[in-house]
């Protein structure tokens, strides 16, 4: 089992795509509110407070694009951002711990699951993992859901500046992917140092075959 390494090229350099300005276009708090865009969609999913919104702001070069909070569970809807009519970036609510009633957690679970199962234009899912915590049971369940629905995904270890050795994370990811019999990109990103941002942009541009 090996992971693919993203090497930005002239045709897939994400900086060309992400030099455009992204804007918020829709929010969905239930499945009936999920819009149907005619553009490719790329989603970001992970546990509460893993850094989804911050990462979206980093790659879009706009710290105010997606609302960021230090309190887990504050993203309570699916947020959709349009990047220059080339791509829809999807910020999903965090799963796992959230200081909200069980009924609300269940509602989020239904919303996330429905979107991942049914989005016609979904091209890639970025499964975000906190580098300090490693891969947890909820992350494994999401990966199983993605594979069951033939969704392509890549693993993004966030807050990479908080750990000094990536080898253990790499080994953990390799072992995890081996159990799934799946191969994908594994990246390390930091919103503070911007580590991995260029490679992530390149992978997204490559996914939608952006070349101009």
UniProtKB/Swiss-Prot annotation:
GO terms for molecular function: GTP binding; metal ion binding. The keyword Translocase does not apply. GO terms for biological process: division septum assembly. Its cofactor is Mg(2+). Gene3D superfamilies: P-loop containing nucleotide triphosphate hydrolases. Mg(2+) binds at residues 53, 75. The keyword Cell division applies. Keywords: Cell cycle, Cell division, GTP-binding, Magnesium, Metal-binding, Nucleotide-binding, Septation. GTP binds at residues 46-53, 73-77, 91-94, 158-161, 189-191. Residues 38-210 form the EngB-type G domain. PROSITE patterns: G_ENGB. Necessary for normal cell division and for the maintenance of normal septation. Belongs to the TRAFAC class TrmE-Era-EngA-EngB-Septin-like GTPase superfamily. EngB GTPase family. PANTHER family: ENGB-TYPE G DOMAIN-CONTAINING PROTEIN, MSS1/TRME-RELATED GTP-BINDING PROTEIN. This is Probable GTP-binding protein EngB. It comes from Rickettsia rickettsii (strain Sheila Smith). The gene is engB.
């Amino acid at each position: 089992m090996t992971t693919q390494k993203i090497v930005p090229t002239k045709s897939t350099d994400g900086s060309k795509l992400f030099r455009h300005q992204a804007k918020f276009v829709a929010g969905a708090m239930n499945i009936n509110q999920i819009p149907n865009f005619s553009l490719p969609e790329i989603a970001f999913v992970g546990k509460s407070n893993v850094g989804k919104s911050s990462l979206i702001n980093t790659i879009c070069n706009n710290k105010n694009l997606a609302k960021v909070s230090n309190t887990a569970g504050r993203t309570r809807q699916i947020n959709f951002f349009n990047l220059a009519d080339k791509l829809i970036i999807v910020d999903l609510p965090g799963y796992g711990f959230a200081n909200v009633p069980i009924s609300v957690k269940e509602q989020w679970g239904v919303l996330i699951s429905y979107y991942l199962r049914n989005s016609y234009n979904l091209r890639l899912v970025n499964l975000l993992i906190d580098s300090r915590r490693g891969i947890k049971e909820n992350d494994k369940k999401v990966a199983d859901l993605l594979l069951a629905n033939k969704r392509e995904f890549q693993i993004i270890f966030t807050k990479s500046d908080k750990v000094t050795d990536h080898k253990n994370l790499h080994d953990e990811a390799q072992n995890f992917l081996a159990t799934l019999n799946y191969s994908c990109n594994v990246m390390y990103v930091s919103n503070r140092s911007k580590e991995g941002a260029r490679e992530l942009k390149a992978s997204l541009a490559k996914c939608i075959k952006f070349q101009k």
